[in-house]
Amino acid sequence: EHGVERLSADFNCTVRDPAYVNDILDRLKREEPRIHDMMLYVEQPFPYDLEANQIDVHSVSARKPLFMDESAHDWRLVRLGRQLGWTGVALKTCKTQTGALLAACWARAHDMPLMVQDLSNPMLAQIPHVLLAAHVSTIAGVETNSMQFYPDASAPEAAIHPGLYRRHEGCVDLSTIRGSGFGYRLHAINRDLPPPEIEV
């Protein structure tokens, strides 16, 4: 229906007992097998502070891939998550580019699938975000939604990188990214920025 092929379930850190998620997944499998089969993964059902909430989640990840999102602040937490039963990692450049790269490297070295998500990255933030997704193998492309929620915020950048700020058949186009500085092409973007806080 509506051409949907894949789904995910994001509990947004609201669950403390794996049995709750297991029950939902088991009921879906029993009562709505088509929906169950479309579900790629379950995302972050449990509290984001993984160190304070070391919940064994192997029973959930035995049913569906279980992705860390809010908990995946750095590679050390990804390591802890894997020990607890998490099977995948959502990377976000807004948690720092370096942190996302290190988490990606650790996860890849331990056969954990990746996805790249955003928090509605507008303007220049969109560029390193999509570049990360282009260079780490993800399970389903990249989540990018700033053009959906506030399209006008990125108008100066979209004039230079139109394919990055407008989806076409579910895809963004990275072909205009080139040159130094993440390929931003700052000299061509007509955006007034405040003066830097620190001069080096």
Predicted regions, residues:
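Catalytic core of soluble alpha/beta enzymes
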Residues: E1-S120, L124-Q126
